[in-house]
């Protein structure tokens, strides 16, 4: 079939990396992952992080998650593509004392997965 004639998957394996997956129609799906920049939760600031490589045409999605389950608080964030090579994030960090949630002014770093082509 057609899949047998497609080029091999290429990319970089590592803490920050990417994979280019050949698709039909001479297109490539690109998946990227890594650790984004550190946000100061509660500051209201929007932070910009860079991808390992720029997407050639479309930066479709980015997903983030707090990367430290041992931390005293849990970070929550939102992210959006900004350019073909960057995305923006904003964060909030919460801690729990009994049944009370407290917002913290603290650093939050994220791991991300980005999808584009």
Task: Please provide the spans of the model-predicted regions.
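Fibrous stalk/shaft segments of extracellular and virion attachment machinery
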Residues: 1-17, 48-53
């Amino acid at each position: 079939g057609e899949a047998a004639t497609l080029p091999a998957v290429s990319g970089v394996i590592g803490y920050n990396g990417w994979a280019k997956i050949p698709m039909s129609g001479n297109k490539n799906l690109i998946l990227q992952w890594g650790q984004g920049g550190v946000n100061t939760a509660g500051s209201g600031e929007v932070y910009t992080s860079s991808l390992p490589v720029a997407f050639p045409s479309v930066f479709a999605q980015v997903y983030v998650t707090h990367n430290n389950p041992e931390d005293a608080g849990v970070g929550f964030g939102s992210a959006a593509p900004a350019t073909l090579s960057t995305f923006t994030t904003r964060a909030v960090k919460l801690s729990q004392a009994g049944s009370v949630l407290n917002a913290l002014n603290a650093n939050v770093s994220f791991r991300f997965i980005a999808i584009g082509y």
